[in-house]
Amino acid sequence: MAKNSMKAREAKRAKLVAKFAEKRAALKAIISDVNASEEDRWNAVLTLQSLPRDSSASRQRNRCNQTGRPHGYLRKFGLSRIKVREACMKGEIPGLRKASW
């Protein structure tokens, strides 16, 4: 199990990403716009740099919903490989079976 502080930190990052998503997208559009003036683009870069670091989506880490484990995460289920296996063996995931050949 991951520490509760790590889970809380990820939740905080998710809130920040949602809060600043529109502002970041607008600034990035200005930065990548070749028709904008150099001064506008430079101001957009500086404004983007002044935003909180954790408001960037790339700083988020996918974690297991049950344990908070960061590695072996399966997007389709939102769980780590260990918890997916346990749920599969209990028959809690419809249509998923252990492979046999």
UniProtKB/Swiss-Prot annotation:
One of its GO terms (biological process) is translation. InterPro entries: Ribosomal_uS14, Ribosomal_uS14_bac/plastid, Ribosomal_uS14_CS. Keywords: Ribonucleoprotein, Ribosomal protein, RNA-binding, rRNA-binding. One of its GO terms (cellular component) is small ribosomal subunit. GO terms for molecular function: rRNA binding; structural constituent of ribosome. Gene3D superfamilies: 1.10.287.1480. The keyword Ribonucleoprotein applies. Binds 16S rRNA, required for the assembly of 30S particles and may also be responsible for determining the conformation of the 16S rRNA at the A site. Part of the 30S ribosomal subunit. Contacts proteins S3 and S10. Belongs to the universal ribosomal protein uS14 family. This is Small ribosomal subunit protein uS14. The gene is rpsN.
